[in-house]
Amino acid sequence: MMKRVLLIFVSFIILGLEADNHEENSSGCDALNPVLGKTTVSIEHEGKNRSYRLYVPKNYKSDVPTPLIINFHGTGSNAEQQAIYSDMDSVADKKGFIHVNPQGLELDGRPVFNAGLTMQSPANKRDFSKAPRDDVDFAKTIVEDVSTKYCLNKKKVYSTGMSNGGRMSYRIGCEAADTFAAIAPVAGVLSLPPEKCQPTKAVPSIAFHGTWDLVSSYKKAGGFSTMGAVQMFSLWAKKNQCKGKPIVTFQGDKVSCESYLSCAEGAEIKFCTIDRGGHCWPGRLGFGSCRLGASSNINGSEMIVDFLLQFERS
């Protein structure tokens, strides 16, 4: 009799664990005839028409919970340009994740995301009161929209982006740790006042920054940055309750990475320096100063994806 009671009890525990795991997979796991490849999706958010570019990899299966990476463009750019510049679609096919590029709304004639810079910011003046938008909530709305159409592993949702998109990723880390498991800012630092950034959970990160970046400064506040990238590395480590000193975790030609490994909830905070790198996506030569500054010796997009996919939201 005791054995039977014990078996029933264990069965309830197992069923409960399976139910908990199932809750993290989206309703889109039941969707029929999913559209693969590239599409543009329009949604309404805060009474405005918004859109995002969606890429579903060739190997997508509707019964397999799939990670999602949201990849934000920089100021003056757009969703399609960011997809091409980062070459994330091809990485999605290799690594098996859904790739989304949100489209920013215009402010003063240029598409931009509200990463937190305001008229009061010391390094830049952006008056979002002229065109208000909550882009953190927009990102969360995108996650929910995708999750109704595709089979998402909702524990494996991530944010990356270039410049303003990198700053947006930091804001997401501050305000949406309940949705996003990790972030990968490129050439951007936190725009919010540090005291207003209070993540509810540890948020692992990998960040890339060039030492010759004149838009988002490497060593000190300047350009569009309220602080230098090196200072941001230390700040994010503190926000994630990291202990000790960073150690070198990658050394390549003109590219090196340091990591804090003893952080809350097993998070890793990683910072990659591109020697004489400009305001560029790592590994993508691009145009202008990026022909000289970007390192073609690494595939930054693959490094980002490999890092992000290690982590699940707790």
Give names to the regions the model predicted.
Residues 123-150, 171:
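Alpha/beta-hydrolase active-site loop
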Residues 181-265:
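The feature captures the conserved acid-bearing segment of alpha/beta-hydrolase catalytic domains
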Residues 70-72, 186, 274:
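Alpha/beta-hydrolase
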Residues 73-77, 277:
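Active-site glycine-rich loops that stabilize anionic/oxyanionic intermediates
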Residues 103-133:
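Cap/lid segment of the alpha/beta-hydrolase catalytic domain
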Residues 70-74, 209-210:
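The conserved beta1-alpha1 loop
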